[in-house]
Amino acid sequence: MSSRLRLKGFVRAAGVDTGLVTVFCRHTSASLTIQENADPDVQADLNEFFRRLVPENMGWLRHTSEGPDDMPAHIKAALTDVSLSIPVTAGRMVLGTWQGIYLFEHRSRPHARRVVLHVAGEPARRYRAREERSQEDRP
């Protein structure tokens, strides 16, 4: 399942009609990106671009205690985004047809990653009606 599908379920469960979903990566050697999701070559090309832009064996790096891929991963994360904001309209994220949300791992080996999701906005009508009924029941 793609990240986009998991986010759709999160937004739906939040019951927001109009608002904003924030996606935040809690790491300094990974980032988030919105990119084309139809052709896997896009992801391969992006990975290759960043590998060439920030290679692992730059002799001038001082932060090397966590391995040769660690400081280049920090630099790649600094060049990209650790958070994304996506508008929500009519209970759905407003993304282009070919846009997908990806966790961009910058280390050579995969690591366990945590992403924080937050939705803020106006509740959908079905939730507003339920909330109004529950307030009427209060003394």
Which role does the model predict for each range below?
Residues M1-P139:
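Active-site histidine-anchored catalytic micro-motif
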